[in-house]
Amino acid sequence: MITSAHIDDIRTQVRAWRAKGETVAFVPTMGNLHQGHITLVKEAAKKCDHVVASIFVNPMQFGQNEDLDAYPRTLEADSQALTAAGAELLFTPTPAIIYPKGLAQQTYVEVPGISDVLCGASRPGHFRGVATIVCKLFNIVQPDIAFFGNKDYQQLLVIRTMVEDLSLPIEIIGIDTIREASGLAMSSRNGYLTAQEKAAAPALKKAIDAMAQGIKQGISIEQVTEEAKASLTAAGFTPDYLEVRHADTLAKAETQDKALVILAAAYLGKARLIDNLRFDR
């Protein structure tokens, strides 16, 4: 696998592949990779001739008092895992390469509406940072297809909307959430959990599953939500949000809506865990 921090190196290699009529897939990451990321790379390798990955801990998407400095950097292990999964080109830029004028002077991309709710409300500016870095990476790599995990459901919709609104010629594919045996969604932030917290963490998935089951049985959204919040609190969580939304627009769920998604974010110790479940009523 070729690894470079420089934009020109990435563009030169991708141009060489394109000159031969070959297709390019892209998997952007922040590193500290787990099996969910590796699954994205393997799926990408099935779809395209070449897979490009990136590792960049993006300062623009972290708010004040968030874990930018603490976020684990594990480049050597990540590089080995990406190579084994089939990636051929790895982009590892520094913040100075991505934002040479600094964050305050950086042109940014903002996806209105869908970026302002749920995680966007809890983490102001987060999705501006996500949309900006993903747009920049798309312009650098210029892939045919890009792969993202469904665990970050709102992020996936923000990126799909950006691609559609800006007429970017890139197919976006979401891959099902990869889970540990306990049901806990794999996340780079699971490493913040103590052993006791990790034992309690599957309660988040159980609460979401119970909500969906209740809604399918005709129980009101309000009732299932209150019961789920109570179960999470009893398990040691501090819920951030727990909501039922229209699966495609993230508008608040209406009685007539069939395609729904439950989205949850909750703190467990130092970790902020997110999860979701899309289902039809």
UniProtKB/Swiss-Prot annotation:
Keywords: ATP-binding, Cytoplasm, Ligase, Nucleotide-binding, Pantothenate biosynthesis. InterPro entries: Cyt_trans-like (IPR004821), Pantoate_ligase (IPR003721), Pantoate_ligase_C (IPR042176), Rossmann-like_a/b/a_fold (IPR014729). ATP binds at residues 30-37, 149-152, 178, 186-189. It is an enzyme of class 6 (ligase). Transmembrane segments: none annotated. The keyword Ligase applies. It comes from the Bacteria. It is found in: Cytoplasm. GO terms for cellular component: cytosol. The active site is at H37. The keyword DNA damage does not apply. GO terms for biological process: pantothenate biosynthetic process. One of its GO terms (molecular function) is pantoate-beta-alanine ligase activity. This is Pantothenate synthetase. It comes from Shewanella oneidensis (strain ATCC 700550 / JCM 31522 / CIP 106686 / LMG 19005 / NCIMB 14063 / MR-1). The lineage of its organism: Bacteria, Pseudomonadati, Pseudomonadota, Gammaproteobacteria, Alteromonadales. The gene is panC.
